[in-house]
């Protein structure tokens, strides 16, 4: 019975990926005209979601990929808004940019006890409080936002009002409230950024974006 569905059980992982990428390149019109480094990121995100329209919604502003790679080579800190991002990032891949990377270089304060208490006492979201706690490390850092739009908006305000300059902002919060607005605000910042417009996003996409950027490093 299962043979009717033409499932190819014996395909190795590399062949599956290659065939998937070939399908994306057949179906995504005009990819050849994109900068190769940006296409690597876009293709990975399309591959992660099986959604070709993801590519049409991505904005690359202020040379984000060279800026991110330079920052990673100097062992910059990484701030993220969810524990899923912190757990999903590959330290092994980060060490391709700098051998000193460890899990402790990936900062996420969303579950910190002091953040929970501060949010409760002030009536604000934990996401805002966590972004404020990370304020001392944001200048020159890589920022990955895949969940909380208010975290993205707070960091955008730091950039606009205080001159804080992350080396990269990945702006991919997801949802229905404050999401579009936070992305539009980020777009006004003179900061290297990769932003997915609209309501779509997610922690998995933020992780995929940084991993895809690392693919632009020379093979070791």
Which stretches of residues belong to each language-model region?
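Buried hydrophobic positions in well-ordered alpha/beta secondary-structure cores of metabolic enzymes
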Residues: 81, 170-171, 209
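Short, ordered loop/turn segments at secondary-structure junctions
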Residues: 83-84, 111-113, 148, 172-175, ...
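Long, charge-patterned amphipathic alpha-helical coiled-coil/hairpin "stalk" segments used as oligomerization
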Residues: 118, 124-182
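Long, charge-dense
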Residues: 94-138
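C-terminal functional extensions of proteins
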Residues: 167, 177-220
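Electropositive, gly/pro-rich neighborhoods at or near active sites that engage anionic ligands
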Residues: 1-79, 87
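General beta-strand structural signal in soluble alpha/beta enzymes
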Residues: 78-80, 108, 144-145, 194-196
